[in-house]
Amino acid sequence: MENFKRRKVQVLAVVLVAMLAALVALGIYFGQTAPRNLYPTEVRDYQGQNLSSIADVRENAIKGTQFLNTSTYRLTVTGLVNRTVEYTYDQILSKFQSYQKIVTIFCVEGWSAKILWQGFLVNDLLNDVGVNTSAVGVIFHASDGYSTELPLSYLRDNNILVAYKMNGLTIPPERGFPFELVAESQYGYKWIKWITQIELTDNPDYLGFWESRGYPNNATIR
């Protein structure tokens, strides 16, 4: 009788283990363990417009993702300005009016993404430091050595943003934290990320990283 009970318990244990294994296998097979959304709270619809996901913006970088610490970060505005200024991350966010607008980034690789950007106007920053009348261009420098130039008139006339949020979320490191230039109507290589320095210049022919490697300085989408 004792042996019978023991065998019964053993059989039940084997059956339970088999059932558990089957449930695990079915869960894997039918995808019950859903992949984690990296950006679970991002805005995907704004004023009736469907937005791309932050994940749709590819991580194109010359030296990989840059990880900048806001406690030591400084944005320097220099060159042909009335005064050279270094701003902390918190100073930028508190000092300048924040704006939002939907802008689509187009890459020369063929992909695009429509994103809700939030940031400050380049124009407001330039007004704060004062610009020399001889300045015609603005060179943006990044922490990884990347650079690109845009005409001063383009930045002023088109309300160009330097963004710190996309789709309602703080820009993640792989997308350019703390600041990315929203160079609307320009191809993606003008959308510089990880900006650390903004330089006013009287040289309209400065060649940035990709421009010095054959990309046209005029990146206007036609």
Task: List PLM regions with ranges.
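Stable alpha-helical elements in mature extracytoplasmic
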Residues: 73, 85-88, 118-121, 125, ...
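A glycine-rich, hydrophobic loop/mini-helix early in the fold
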Residues: 65-113
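Extended, aromatic/histidine-rich regions of cofactor-dependent oxidoreductases associated
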Residues: 2-75, 128-222
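N-terminal post-signal-peptidase region of extra-cytosolic proteins
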Residues: 56-63, 91, 108, 119
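Mid-length scaffold segments of soluble, non-membrane domains
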Residues: 97-150
